[in-house]
Amino acid sequence: MEYAELLKRLTVDCKDDGKQFRKKDRIHEIKALLENSGYELLGEGSLSLLYGKPMEEENTYRTLVSSHVDCVYKNCFAKDEDELCWKGTFDNSATNAAVIDLMLRGELDESVLVAFTGDEEKDSAGAIEIMQMLGRMECLVGKALVLDVTNEGWEDEAAFSIENDHGFDIITGYHIVELLQASGASCVFVHEAEPDETWEYSKGSSSDLPGIPCLSPVSYTHLRAHETPEHL
C-alpha cells in the first residue's frame, strides 16, 4: 500500500478525554493495517497501543518510536490538491502513516518498538501508559524518537525539525547530524520547543525505569506529496 493511501486511511477522527479514547476511528484503522504485518500488539492501554516484532526476550528491544493519534480537528480530511501538495488535517496522521509505512515495508529493525498514544495534545497520558508498560516488561530501551507535526520549520523552508532533545550524548548528536547531512533533507534544530511526549519519556517512571534519551523528528504541517516517509 502506498503512503498516500495510508495517509487517507489514517486521517480520520481520534479523540480522548484524558482517560480513554472516545473516538476510535484511527485506532481501528491502525489495528486493521497491522493485523497481518508481522508486528504483535504487545500492550494496549486506555490511551495507547504498543507494537513490536515477536522476540524471545522482551528486554532486547532497544528503540521506541512514538506517534500520537489524538487530534483536535472537528472534521478530518485528506485531499490530493495537485501533483505537489496535499491538503488536509495531518496532525498527526502524517507521522502515523509514515511509521506504519515503514513497518509494512519491513524498514524498521526488529529491536524497535512502536507506540501510538493519546492525550498528547494535553497531558501526554498515553506516553505515561507506555512508560508503565515498559516497566512491566522490564524493557530498558536506549532511545526514543517522538514523531509529530508542527510549523517550526516553516520559515526556514525545512523538510522537518529536530525538537526537544533530552539526554542524548554528544557522540550520538554528531551521528544524527551526519545522517541528516547525508540524506540531503533540510532541517532545523529547536532545542526547547513546545512541550511534547519527550518530556514524559525523558523523566522515566520509577527508579527501575529511568528516563529515556529522546528527541522529536518533526514534519512541518505543509506536507508535500512527493516527500517520502523517510523525510517525516
PLM segments and residue spans:
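Short secondary-structure junctions
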Residues: 36-44, 84, 185-191
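Short glycine-enriched loops at secondary-structure junctions
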Residues: 67-72, 147-151, 220
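Active-site metal-coordination/substrate-binding segment of hydrolases
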Residues: 33, 43, 59-116
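Conserved small/polar residues in nucleotide/adenosyl-binding loops
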Residues: 221-230
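Conserved beta-strand scaffold positions in the cores of enzyme catalytic domains, especially
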Residues: 41, 114, 144-146, 212-216
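Acidic/histidine-rich catalytic neighborhood of metal-dependent amide-processing enzymes
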Residues: 88-181, 185-207
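A non-catalytic alpha/beta surface segment that caps or lines the substrate-entry region
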Residues: 9-59
